[in-house]
Structure formats: structure tokens, C-alpha cells
């Protein structure tokens, strides 16, 4: 038995992905395409919000996405949508624009992380603070480890089996479940739109 909002209705996931692909989103927006999310579509504008309901709490996965995601009315309308169903909305990992809208509604906020964006054209490993990164890079080079961009469909059967084995071993060694809600798992790697970077040693 599924609780309200615990899973998307047929077609909602495809519709949400189309909204996302038309443009407009944050660092977590692609995660909204994963299974297990429900979707709310803003009336009259091109925006949507992915969420999951636990008890009477509706937790969003990031903020709104879509071309009209920055419209202040989107967050307000989602709050009203939740209120009509007796849910308390919680906006998880939203940007400053969306936070400002919620501030106007008298909401409080708690910082859970910081987002770092690196420009590959200007980033450098130079400097004392990045000594550990240089050490790891040099060691990998000595041991013949190289990085390779690929997709799940391009991997060989052997590579796929090894990745599954690594994933299962990681889960078996932990006392907590795989954190699919924010980090994803093997299932999410199989999406054709997802690029993978794998590290190969000198023997492969």
C-alpha cells in the first residue's frame, strides 16, 4: 500500500523529466527523475517540485525545477497544495532565491551543506591546502590508475558486474542503508543521460 505522494502516478515522471529538460534547475534537480518521487506541477507556469511524503511531512528533493522555477508563486502554491492535504512541507536543499521566498512567509532555515562549483579551466591543485590532492594524484599516476568517462551502456558485462560487486560490498560493510535519496545507487547509473567516471588500474 502506497501512502499519498510516496510514488509518482503513471506519466508524472515522464512529464517531470520533460519540464526539467526544457531548462531550469539546481544541483539536485536531475535526482528528481529517480523512482520513488511524487511530483507537483505548478499551475499556469513551467515548473514542478519532486517530493516524498513520510507521515504528514512532505519533503522536497531540492527546489522547484523548470523554466519558471524562480517565480515566487511556485513555492507559495506548493505550500498551499500541502496545506490542503494536511501535510507540513519541508524544502530540502534549496538555493538562495527559493529561500528568500520562504523567508517572506516567515519560515526558518537550517544550513545542511555548502555547494562547491569548480571551473575546470581555472582550477589548480597548487597551494598548501591541496597537498593531499596532489599526493593522491601522483600516487595514482605511479600505480597506473587512470580516470575514464563512460556510460553504463558502454561498459562491458565484466565492468558492470564489478561495479555491482563493489556497491554490494560497501552496503554489506555499513550499519546504515544505501543513501539512495541523495546519492543514488547502481539503478540510477543505468540512465542513458548519466555519465560515469570510473577509475581503472594498470591491470584493466
What residue spans do the PLM features occupy?
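Glycine-rich phosphate-binding "P-loop"
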Residues: 60-69
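Conserved acetyl-CoA-binding loop-helix of GNAT-fold acetyltransferases
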Residues: 69-80
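Short glycine-/small-residue-rich flexible loop motifs, especially phosphate/cofactor-binding loops
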Residues: 79, 99, 137
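Acidic/polar active-site rim loop that often engages polyanionic ligands
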Residues: 114-121, 138-145
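"Short basic amphipathic alpha-helical interaction patches in structured regions
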Residues: 73-75, 130-132, 136
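A conserved beta-strand-loop-helix scaffold within acyl/acetyltransferase catalytic domains
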Residues: 5-56, 63, 87, 91-109, ...
